[in-house]
UniProtKB/Swiss-Prot annotation:
This is Ion-translocating oxidoreductase complex subunit D. Part of a membrane-bound complex that couples electron transfer with translocation of ions across the membrane. Required to maintain the reduced state of SoxR. Probably transfers electron from NAD(P)H to SoxR. The keyword Zinc does not apply. The modification FMN phosphoryl threonine is found at residue 187. Belongs to the NqrB/RnfD family. It comes from the Bacteria. Keywords: Cell inner membrane, Cell membrane, Electron transport, Flavoprotein, FMN, Membrane, Phosphoprotein, Translocase, Transmembrane, Transmembrane helix, Transport. GO terms for cellular component: oxidoreductase complex; plasma membrane; plasma membrane protein complex. Pfam families: NQR2_RnfD_RnfE (PF03116).
């Protein structure tokens, strides 16, 4: 009889990294479908560009480091990084922007630290922030949802705008961004912040076409609900834990409610915060990154709550309309400290 001697751990989780990443990619399908429906084919083009760029960038670095290219690419982490960045940027952003952001995310924010499992910051959000700071105009040029859009670009038009800046008929981004009221549209969060600073009342702002949705912003409410559906499926599959999404959303809702009660003329209502921007995408797909989030249950609650507070502060008082990316990166910085003070006590040892 032959006995096999193996080192610990002796109990293994059968779900490999590649399977977890694949589950997250599958869970993103409802959110992607919603963005395609409300914002057009540009989202699909950006996803394809980001995916190819992520795989090529990762393969190049692995080749230079003389590591197995095929084995590493099979973990699907590069694909997920590209996907998260692609759905975070405007659908008709120039092609070179998503390529630049993805390459930066994979090479600088991930591989430079040693690859998957070593990076302290979420790579997709690093790429997003680099693009936002470097090209703020292009990164905030979102199309109006098709419900209130005048010009809805088709698949060919989307490709032409992304690669040349113009449609076949000569239309550009300024034309495509016009809403049914003839005014260039922005996201619900951007519209609210800009209008408040211009001295408009909340009652006036809520009459804008972008807020014609049942719950929050037109189109955006359904996009967020679609990402929420994908997130709930991830929880059901036990691919992520509930601590971070719950604490993030509860904290954001509480802060928004308190702010709205104390200053209803300058601060957005809770439903605007919860169902606009990247709220649900951030709660279930970005903050839950196991590499850059806290590793203890108490730590996850603190981590999520901190991110929720930061999102509300940035949206309400900062210079950017949506603070999810900045909140994620700032929360990432605190992870070592959070884990240090929330680590479980070793059995048989006194606390401290």
């Amino acid at each position: 009889m032959v006995f096999r001697i193996a080192s610990s751990p002796y109990t293994h989780n059968q779900r490999q990294t590649s399977r977890i990443m694949l589950l997250v990619l599958l869970a993103a399908v409802p959110g992607i479908a919603a963005q395609l429906w409300f914002f057009g084919w540009g989202t699909l083009v950006q996803i394809l560009l980001a995916s190819v760029s992520a795989l090529l960038a990762e393969a190049l670095v692995l080749k230079l480091r003389k590591q197995s290219v095929a084995a590493t690419l099979k973990d699907n982490s590069a694909l997920l990084t590209g996907l998260l960045l692609a759905v975070s940027i405007p659908p008709l952003a120039p092609w070179w922007m998503v390529v630049l952001g993805t390459v930066f995310a994979v090479i600088i924010a991930k591989q430079l630290y040693g690859g998957l499992g070593q990076n302290p910051f979420n790579p997709a959000m690093i790429g997003y922030v680099v693009l936002l700071i470097s090209f703020p105009v292009q990164m905030t040029s979102w199309l109006p949802p098709h419900e209130i859009a005048v010009n809805i670009p088709g698949f060919i038009d989307a490709i032409q705008v992304i690669f040349s800046g113009h449609t076949a008929s000569g239309g550009d981004m300024n034309t495509l961004r016009l809403g049914i009221d003839g005014i260039s549209q922005a996201t619900p969060l951007d519209t609210f912040k800009t209008s408040v600073r211009a001295g408009h009342s909340v009652e006036q702002i809520m009459q804008y076409p972008i807020y014609s949705g049942i719950l929050a912003g037109a189109g955006w409410q359904w996009v967020n609900l679609a990402w929420l559906a994908g997130g709930v499926w991830l929880l059901w599959q036990k691919a992520i834990r509930w601590h971070i999404p719950l604490s993030f959303l509860v904290t954001l809702a509480l802060c928004a409610m308190l702010g709205w009660l104390f200053s209803p003329e300058t601060l957005a209502a809770p439903q605007i915060h919860l169902l606009s921007g990247a709220t649900m995408l951030g709660a279930f797909f970005i903050l839950t990154d196991p590499v850059t989030a806290s590793t203890t249950n108490r730590g996850r609650l603190i981590f999520g709550a901190l991110a929720g507070l930061l999102v509300w502060l940035i949206r309400s008082f900062g210079g950017y309309p949506d603070g999810v990316a900045f909140a994620v990166l700032l929360a990432n910085i605190t992870v070592p400290l959070i884990d240090y003070y929330t680590r479980p006590r070793v059995y048989g040892h006194r606390k401290g």
